[in-house]
Amino acid sequence: RLMPSEKWNLSVFGKHYNSYSEGTVQLSDNNVGSDTRVSQSVSSFGYGAAGTYFLGKAIQLKLSYEKALRMPSTQELFGDGDLEAGKADLKPERSDNVNLSASYNKQLGKHGLYVEGGVIYRNTQDYIKRDLSTVGGTSYGSYTNHGRVETKGFNVSLRYSYSNWFNMGGTFNNLDTRDKEKKRAASSGQNALTYGQRIPNIPYQYANVDMNFYWHNLFAKGNTLTFGWDCFYQHDFPLYWENFGDPSTKIRVPQQISHNLSLGYSIRNGRYNISFECRNLTDEKLYDNFSLQKAGRAFYGKFRVYFGK
């Protein structure tokens, strides 16, 4: 790490990736069937650099580059024996990642303000793409290496605080991930019909907002009452390639908006804590993984005691 002055610094790093995976995968003519023991080992090297520059005390600029490797996960390699069919010969994703961001942090009396914005560029080879297939009336997820994929995006964050009793903030993310493989296969020479299309089955626009209140020394010194609200938004996105088929009959993962409320009370500087939470306040239909719907409106309570000094 190089730190020639308080205004800027530069870091250079290297990473060695070494992975060995062994497990059971389902293999048959349709990728669902008998269990077979398989294994795979991967060894590679990555590197990168990151720099920071301060414009005065309030503004910070950041720039980074990384030659990165993403190893296939256990589920991507071996499936889960139910809704996910593994692919034991998946290759790691190899990508060139560039990130540029700027932030502003200012405290004016009891008021605090933090703003950050950034842009992202990622050029990925052997992108691990998740597909959906149906065989004999049974649907399952599967994985393939897709060649070249390009991601461009941006994110914005904003947070405001007043003294020690109120804060609110939020983030907005937009990631445009597109197929950049021009040919269907290197040997065929045929143009790929999906070239330039958005990669399906991936959220590309989402945001969250939260608000929190704190009442210190309520009812007794060292006791604090907290109340919080947060909201998550996710834009709808296509389940399959969006330029294929009739637009009126295409399957899309619907837009999702969820609200959560929380109430907590800590006693004697946090030795005793009581909390209550309502998740998915408006009882919306929310989805996580393929074929897995999240719970509707739910209530939780928790009591915690800290036995340390």
Indicate where each model-derived feature is located.
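Signature of Gram-negative outer-membrane beta-barrel scaffolds
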Residues: 1-56, 71, 176, 184
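Conserved C-terminal beta-signal and adjacent last beta-strands/turns
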Residues: 45, 49-52, 63, 91-100, ...
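Residue-level signal for pocket-adjacent positions within structured domains
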Residues: 64, 69, 85, 119, ...
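Extracellular loop and loop/strand-boundary signature of outer-membrane beta-barrel proteins
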Residues: 28-38, 82-90, 139-145, 153-155, ...
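Outer-membrane beta-barrel translocator domains and adjoining extracellular loop/strand segments
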Residues: 22-31, 74-81, 127-135, 175, ...
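Transmembrane beta-strands of outer-membrane beta-barrel pores
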Residues: 16-22, 65-71, 78-80, 106, ...
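Membrane-embedded beta-barrel scaffold of Gram-negative outer-membrane proteins
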Residues: 52-56, 60-66, 92-152, 173
